[in-house]
Amino acid sequence: VNANVAVNDHFSFGGMLAHVGTANVRMGNGKKNNDFDNVYGFNAKYNVGKLDVHGEWVKASGLSDSDIWNVGAKWGNYKIDKKNSWAVGLDYYDQAKNAPIFKTQKYESNDLQKTTRFEGYKAWELGASYAPEKNIGINAYYGFNAKTQEGNRVNDYYRADLNFKF
């Protein structure tokens, strides 16, 4: 269940609840099954013109060290169906070691060091999006200053994707 409310033209907030059950999924802590039944979270966004400031917090029920939050800012008005639209953004992520992270487009563990410590992580991520043609989007991300929750340095990371809207 996901609900979002626009308070006015500039501010919105929302919440979500997902029943996960006993699905056998790979978690951010390296486990291949989960220790919880539900995931819940809240988000908020404020925008004025091309500026967007946002944040989100998510937690697994009944599991310690299982929250993840992020805050960020974005400048631009990227829309994949609008030719030459663009946006740039900066986000900060803080993920506890047992956070309910299923493989997403975000970096979710410290296994870039080829270890199995899975201590959670904290990192900054710089992103940019551009639509060179209608319904074609190019996105690039660079994560930096990443550390585990215990303060161990994690490699910087980057990725790019090309999206088509049909």
Where are each of the predicted segments found?
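Mobile, glycine-rich extracellular loop/lid and propeptide segments
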Residues: V1-A3
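Outer-membrane beta-barrel pore domains
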Residues: A6-F166
